[in-house]
Amino acid sequence: MKNTPIERHLIDETINEFQIVDFSKATIREVKAIASKAETASGVEFIKMEMGVPGLPPSAVGVKAEIEALQNGIASLYPDINGLPELKKEASNFIKAFINVDLSPEGCVPVTGSMQGTFASFLTCSQCDEKKDTILFIDPGFPVQKQQLVVMGQKFETFDVYDYRGEKLKEKLESYLKKGNISAIIYSNPNNPSWICLKEEELRIIGELATLYDVIVLEDLAYFAMDFRQDLSKPYQPPFQPSVAHYTDNYVLLISGSKAFSYAGQRIGVSCISDKLYHRSYPGLTKRYGGGTFGTVFIHRVLYALSSGTSHSAQFAMAAMLKAANEGQYNFLNEVKIYGERARKLKEIFLRQIGRAHV
């Protein structure tokens, strides 16, 4: 039997305790729970690579603002489900400053981390048109987003973008959209875990096809502006973070505080709905809720059913971080550039191993 750092029977027994039939399909959280249990039982420390925890300190700007908010008694008050006005304003400014897109504060909605924003987006998109009951993933992406759809009982399809870069993406994407059952497209850009970035040409294809087939694009910007091959840190100056928002009005941008601002523990993000989409009514939403637009249903029906608002104090933190970044007082990318350095080292290691495998 092959020797391993941890006795195989210990891992097998732990997996069996969780009653996981196919470990290859375990969620990130299940992998973490099993690793923690095996670590305790064996006494052998595990190197955790299943969670995106780079060990960076949280933004001092955010911490200071949140402490002040708590000291002022904000914890006793329910947050407005629409979001803190200051945060909505600064999120709108942030999108203009770093993406060069105009989007009203009204459509910038605080959420309990981008995961909640994605969950609410999936629900809302899937209810717009009864004929469109499927979400399309341009992979690789965030595995838990598929788990969210499994929890909802919603359908999804997926393809890996690796073989469909550039103009090839159009034919592949259209092969799904022309079926008429896709309600939304979701992808991550910059991408985790592959660290690829979609090009302007590819974003244009996605945007134009989304408009043609009347599909909503969910753009996951968790690793905002982390294409360290160019400097995207200067507000209101090119180059800007590439976005599908330049090519369609059918979009929701998912901004996260977890990675760009190392504020993962407080679960804060902003879902930014385009002005046109926010005010658009859909027959499916009218039938289900008796009225409302995409934006009002997203906030006052779906989000409200998930939570009575997003952490009040964390909204003050996010507002302060965005404001400082918008005004050029806080270069948030300087604090997270280690992501790029580590990615570069990993790429070198992977390429070196591939080279050895072919020797």
Go through the PLM ranges and name each one.
Residues 71, 75-213, 218, 224-247, ...:
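Conserved core of the PLP fold type I
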Residues 247-337, 348-355:
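Conserved core segment of the aminotransferase class I/II
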Residues 31, 49, 66, 91, ...:
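Generic structural signal for small/hydrophobic residues in well-ordered secondary structure
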Residues 4-11, 17-116, 167, 322-326:
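N-terminal small-domain helix-loop-helix segment of the aminotransferase-like
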Residues 357-359:
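Conserved small/polar residues in nucleotide/adenosyl-binding loops
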